[in-house]
From Swiss-Prot:
Segments for region (Disordered): 135-154, 265-285
Biological process according to GO: mRNA splicing, via spliceosome; RNA folding; U2-type prespliceosome assembly
Extra facts: Present with 1360 molecules/cell in log phase SD medium.
Protein name as it appears in the record: Cold sensitive U2 snRNA suppressor 2
Signal peptide (from-to): none
A GO-annotated cellular component: U2 snRNP
Start and end residues of each RRM domain: 45-130, 183-265
Molecular function terms from GO: RNA binding; U2 snRNA binding
Acidic residues bias: start-end ranges: 276-285
Basic and acidic residues bias spans: 135-149
Organism classification: Eukaryota, Fungi, Dikarya, Ascomycota, Saccharomycotina
Amino acid sequence: MDADELELKGHLKKLKKEELLRRKQLKESNLQKRELEYNNASKNTSIYISGLPTDKTTKEGLTEQFCKYGMIRTNRDGEPLCKLYVNDKGAFKGDALITYSKEESVTLAIEMMNESIFLGKQIRVERAQFQNKEGDNMHGKENDLKEFNGPEPPIKRLKKAKSEGEGEVIDYNDDESLAKADRTVIFANVFNIYKSYTNDDINDIQEDLLEGCEEIGQVDSISVSPNKGEATVVFKNNKVALQCCKIMTGRYFDGQKLLAFISGDENTSSTSDKNEDSEVEDDLI
């Protein structure tokens, strides 16, 4: 292993220890407060849209537009959670409610669509307040609801790197017989351990992470552990794994700042380091 690789491994190990210490201190200081704040925020993943054209708006058209800003939740029948509201006379009043899978999609949708023009009218998009209004009912007549063929693919959480040396597929002819741990990358902070994920959410995150890693080099396998907030990726060789750590560490993935390190590096740590790391790795979010 050359000097640059040794320096990179040392730097990544230092970053990992600093991050683990920071997170341990954060947990001790305000874990309960953060969990409460997150639970309050995560309850509201809906937007309320008003000012929609009463003669042109359809559920299908609305979901096709707003799925661009995040994955829309679906009901048991697989239909997107989009409600069109009517007044006391049964006429569409120009208001709608859309529920996303993730809270950050609400912020993006508001930023992109509030006071924008939709079907020739300026609309207002805001975070839903869930206040019951007299006379409001879901616009649920069968002949008013059109079949929705599914949202567009969600926005990719990992984009191809543009900086020098990133985003290129690395094909090393490595004939060394490397231990699996030395070519295994552990991604911490992939999942928020205080958040509930559906199976579809987990599959989407795994697919996006795999896509990002395959842009760097050949991947043998990938697995995720939402309860620990981690993902494990096994590469073809150690050089690709090191390059992955260099590229991915510090990158934001689904709103989470990634920490990537070689699994085999932990075997070189002292016993005290292992004990300290094991206390807090399960607390990474």
